[in-house]
């Protein structure tokens, strides 16, 4: 990460979940570089603090927060932490998630289904439920939800994940309509297979074949799209689904 070079976001405050690694981390670093005060939230506080230390060492503003996004009270506390630490909340990137069990629908356990829905869908609702009032109180802002290409198409053997991400897509659209005239823009980002810990267990060569571009995506490439959607450059963009997938879904 380069030293802080701009104040493009005019001293805005952002809450990012799942920010201890992968796309969330890359987005936290990029936003900090552009002058955003970032709450780096993750279920792994040590990982979150490492990201904060990196940001602060380079002249940015950040604070670590431990939160299990599947627990409503944790998200309430995360939003309160953002406001108490930096004075307001203007931006949110609801990014935390898990892949869950890889099994056919009949073999997917009930517990596995509930967990993947809770972490990937319910958690986004819990997050927005508490973020929206804070953002309204700050005079408006923007939210981006991570929904994956699995929120647009079917993928076998991860039915719970696919269902959850389709739910995030729908939730994003509904909320965008509710707050379009109230000063909050809400969009979703839909990455293909990105080189993050989420897909570390899979064979990379096989995943590369799924993308006509001939490679996997990098977290920084998704972060650039998220930063755009959170910025005033996207002032007329709300209720949209931004696909970052190397043409995966164009086949």
Swiss-Prot record:
Gene3D superfamilies in UniProt: NAD(P)-binding Rossmann-like Domain
EC number in record: 1.1.1.245
Phenotype of gene-disrupted mutants: Mutant accumulates cyclohexanol.
GO molecular function, one term: oxidoreductase activity
Keywords associated with the record: NAD, Oxidoreductase
Residues forming the catalytic site: 161
InterPro entries: NAD(P)-bd_dom_sf (IPR036291), Sc_DH/Rdtase_CS (IPR020904), SDR_fam (IPR002347)
Database matches in SUPFAM superfamilies: NAD(P)-binding Rossmann-fold domains
Entry-linked Pfam families: adh_short_C2
Reactions catalysed: cyclohexanol + NAD(+) = cyclohexanone + NADH + H(+)
Ligand binding (NAD(+)): 42, 95, 161, 165, 194, 196
Function: Catalyzes the oxidation of cyclohexanol to cyclohexanone. Required for the conversion of cyclohexanol to adipic acid.
Family per record: Belongs to the short-chain dehydrogenases/reductases (SDR) family.
Protein known as: Cyclohexanol dehydrogenase
Organism annotation: Acinetobacter sp. (strain SE19)
């Amino acid at each position: 990460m380069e030293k802080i070079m701009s104040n493009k976001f005019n001293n805005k405050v952002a809450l990012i979940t799942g920010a201890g690694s992968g796309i969330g981390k890359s987005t936290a670093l990029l936003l900090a570089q552009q002058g955003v005060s970032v709450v780096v939230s993750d279920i792994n506080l040590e990982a979150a603090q490492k990201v904060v230390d990196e940001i602060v060492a380079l002249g940015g503003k950040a604070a670590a927060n431990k939160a299990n996004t599947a627990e409503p009270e944790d998200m309430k506390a995360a939003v309160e932490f953002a406001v108490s630490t930096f004075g307001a909340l203007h931006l949110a990137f609801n990014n935390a998630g898990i892949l869950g069990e890889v099994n056919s629908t009949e073999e997917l356990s009930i517990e596995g289904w509930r967990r993947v829905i809770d972490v990937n869908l319910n958690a986004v609702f819990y997050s927005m439920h508490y973020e929206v009032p804070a953002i309204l109180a700050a005079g408006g802002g923007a939210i981006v939800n991570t929904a994956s290409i699995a929120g647009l198409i079917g993928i076998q053997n991860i039915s719970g994940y696919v269902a959850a991400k389709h739910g995030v897509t729908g939730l994003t659209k509904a909320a965008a309509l509710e707050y379009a005239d109230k000063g909050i823009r809400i969009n979703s980002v839909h990455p293909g297979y990105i080189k993050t810990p989420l897909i570390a267990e899979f064979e990379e060569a096989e995943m590369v074949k799924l993308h006509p571009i001939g490679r996997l995506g990098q977290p920084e490439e998704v972060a650039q799209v998220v930063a755009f959607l959170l910025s005033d450059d996207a002032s007329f963009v709300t209720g949209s689904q931004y696909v970052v997938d190397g043409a995966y879904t164009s086949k």
